[in-house]
Regions:
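Short, polar/flexible loop-turn hinges at active-site or ligand-entry regions and domain interfaces
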Residues: 59-63, 112-121, 342-343
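Active-site SXXK
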Residues: 48-61
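Short amphipathic alpha-helices in soluble, non-transmembrane regions
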Residues: 105-110, 208-214, 326-332
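Non-catalytic beta-strand/loop surface segments
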Residues: 1-39, 63-99, 137-192, 216-262, ...
Length: 435
């Protein structure tokens, strides 16, 4: 049975899509503003710009001083933040419903007038903030650069998904104020965004407020389409083997998967869940509980809309265990799933896990606003949130096996290993990437 969350949509004259889902359960309202720009939209030489704007958006606009966006909303009881991803950028806040007008005014002011505050001083300041973020989250954190390494060898640096949202520090260093202004004018306008309002507000009041604060903002020229990232499974095995000071030896594998919004992606995602989601997964039973060669295993799909998605499997070795044995055990289970398939019980378990996770996400105003925005922006269909459980339950065990045999294969993977220097042996891994 599909869910029945109320959803209403309007498009303003300037192209802003507005999605409203009233919920009078608690006096809270969630506001999400999603822009159709992420790292896959960045041309060569401009990597990291979408993420840079995630920071610049809080440095003031025409009518808001630097730092005041956070201060005003927090004074109104809000929690707020932003995130940048391959496919989109998201600005969001949840607050008592009496603060809705404040939240909308602040979002509209930076959509319309952000560039009034983007000067050389602010650019230099936020460029330094991003560099520090990269040092803390990527360079100086154990395994912090694993995804950066994986997407490079899984897609290649010229693919839309071949670089992380943090971007290239060389590109950011070379960026001028004029470059940054041009990127904003190209992507940050009402006709390239979705505004979602969920919570304690009447449908008509929400639409009127959206029009009041955003209706005057002119549309931008049609943004350029993101490059097509359509590509099939990885051919062969691409490796990057790293020796450095890490807490434990680790192996992580990446597989290209079908694009989001397809039954094939749902089936491949369920295959990865059977392998690595939860205590009852095949890899946890074998590597952690039975063979006791791994401290933990994890994995899953990362859905993307640009022609291809990807999924991962990761194992953290126990001290003294041979990482090659961890690798071999993972690959044996990968091949076994593709060859022998899964049981109906396994399918039912991972489908139930997905249903639970989905219901928990939609249970809060903030979570529902996030998913409505996601489906409105990337699929043009916010009502998909009510059908999503049925889509997952429609996948059969045969489809899971077919997807695994096509996409989740031992001979179609990118792989990064991290080993401590003391566990290095000449008989273990070759170093460097083999493309």
């Amino acid at each position: 049975m599909p869910l029945n969350y109320p959803i209403a949509e309007q498009t303003l004259d300037n192209g802003l899509r507005v999605v409203v889902s009233p919920d009078r359960g608690v006096p809270i309202v969630a506001v999400n503003l999603w822009y159709d720009v992420g790292s896959r939209h960045e041309p060569p030489g401009l990597t990291g710009f979408a993420h840079l704007f995630e920071h610049l958006m809080f440095q003031g606009s025409r009518n808001v001083r630097s730092g005041e966006h956070f201060a005003l909303l927090e004074q109104a009881g809000a929690s707020l933040n932003a995130s940048t991803f391959f496919d989109r950028t998201n600005y969001y806040e949840s607050l008592p419903s009496g603060g809705l007008d404040l939240a909308l005014w602040l979002e509209a002011d930076r959509m319309a007038y952000l560039l009034d505050a983007v000067n050389q001083e602010n650019l230099d300041n936020q460029r330094d903030v991003v560099k520090e973020e990269k040092r803390q989250s990527y360079d100086n954190r154990p395994y912090g650069d694993s995804y950066e390494r994986l997407v490079t060898i899984a897609f290649g640096e010229n693919h839309p998904y071949g670089h992380m949202t943090i971007g290239s520090m060389a590109d950011l260093d070379a960026a001028t104020v004029e470059d940054v202004h041009a990127f904003f004018r190209k992507h940050y306008g009402p006709n390239n965004a979705v505004l979602t309002i969920v919570g304690d507000v009447a449908e008509e009041d929400a639409f009127m407020a959206a029009k009041r604060y955003f209706g005057h903002i002119p549309a931008i020229p049609q943004p350029p389409a993101a490059p097509d990232g359509s590509v099939g499974p990885i051919t062969g095995v691409a490796r990057d083997d790293v020796v450095e000071d890490v807490p434990s030896d680790l192996i992580t594998m990446m597989f290209r998967l079908p694009a989001d919004g397809t039954p094939e992606l749902d089936a491949a995602a369920l295959a990865l869940d059977v392998l690595a989601a939860g205590q009852s997964s095949r890899l946890n039973r074998r590597l952690v509980r039975e063979e006791q060669i791994a401290q933990s295993v994890s994995g899953g799909a990362l859905p993307l809309v640009g022609g291809v998605s990807f999924g991962t499997l990761t194992g953290v070795a126990v001290d003294g265990a041979d990482l090659r044995r961890v690798e071999d055990s993972i690959l044996e289970e990968v091949e076994k799933l593709a060859t022998d398939g899964i049981t109906e019980d396994e399918l039912g378990t991972v489908q139930a896990q997905n249903e639970r996770d989905w219901l928990e996400q939609l249970a809060t105003c903030a979570g529902r606003a996030d998913e409505l925005s996601h489906n409105a922006l990337l699929f043009g269909d916010p009502g998909r949130i009510n059908r999503r459980i049925d889509e997952v339950h429609a996948v059969t065990a045969e489809q899971v096996q077919q997807a695994a045999a096509e996409w989740v294969r031992a001979d179609r993977r990118a792989q990064v290993t991290y080993r401590r220097a003391e566990s290095t042996s000449s008989a273990s891994f070759m170093s460097g990437a083999q493309l």
